[in-house]
Amino acid sequence: MSMNDPLSDMIARIKNAATRKRAKVATPASKLRARVLDVLADEGYIRGYSLVEKPGAFPEFEIELKYFDGEPVIAEIARVSKPGRRVYSSIKDLKPIKNGLGISILSTPKGVMSDSAARDANVGGEVLCRVY
């Protein structure tokens, strides 16, 4: 099966697993997904992830979801920039998500980072997704 937007697929898997209160979710591995998962782990939205390689199969990431008082820490995760409509933002245009309680994940010339890290580095870029 071909996949047009692997990042949207990962976001949908995380959303579905959190709704079903799963402890872990698997998704095919890629460099972009790894960098987005690094940001989610650094910001405290997931416990972590590990690379699982099975013989004769493509490598996968096993993502450990995080819960607080039985509720998922990721209340909402949504793709912003899509293959059909790319969304770019400068530093001035980056608005806080949910009054600073959420983050935007950006792909910048300096790598994939959160909106606060992008402000510190003074770089804009493609807004991949929003998390709160």
From Swiss-Prot:
<keyword id="KW-0687">Ribonucleoprotein</keyword>
<keyword id="KW-0699">rRNA-binding</keyword>
<dbReference type="InterPro" id="IPR047863">
    <property type="entry name" value="Ribosomal_uS8_CS"/>
</dbReference>
<dbReference type="GO" id="GO:0003735">
    <property type="term" value="F:structural constituent of ribosome"/>
</dbReference>
<comment type="similarity">
    <text>Belongs to the universal ribosomal protein uS8 family.</text>
</comment>
<dbReference type="GO" id="GO:0005840">
    <property type="term" value="C:ribosome"/>
</dbReference>
<comment type="subunit">
    <text>Part of the 30S ribosomal subunit. Contacts proteins S5 and S12.</text>
</comment>
<dbReference type="GO" id="GO:1990904">
    <property type="term" value="C:ribonucleoprotein complex"/>
</dbReference>
<dbReference type="Pfam" id="PF00410">
    <property type="entry name" value="Ribosomal_S8"/>
</dbReference>
<dbReference type="GO" id="GO:0019843">
    <property type="term" value="F:rRNA binding"/>
</dbReference>
<dbReference type="InterPro" id="IPR035987">
    <property type="entry name" value="Ribosomal_uS8_sf"/>
</dbReference>
<dbReference type="InterPro" id="IPR000630">
    <property type="entry name" value="Ribosomal_uS8"/>
</dbReference>
<keyword id="KW-0689">Ribosomal protein</keyword>
<dbReference type="GO" id="GO:0006412">
    <property type="term" value="P:translation"/>
</dbReference>
<comment type="function">
    <text>One of the primary rRNA binding proteins, it binds directly to 16S rRNA central domain where it helps coordinate assembly of the platform of the 30S subunit.</text>
</comment>
<protein>
    <recommendedName>
        <fullName>Small ribosomal subunit protein uS8</fullName>
    </recommendedName>
</protein>
<keyword id="KW-0694">RNA-binding</keyword>
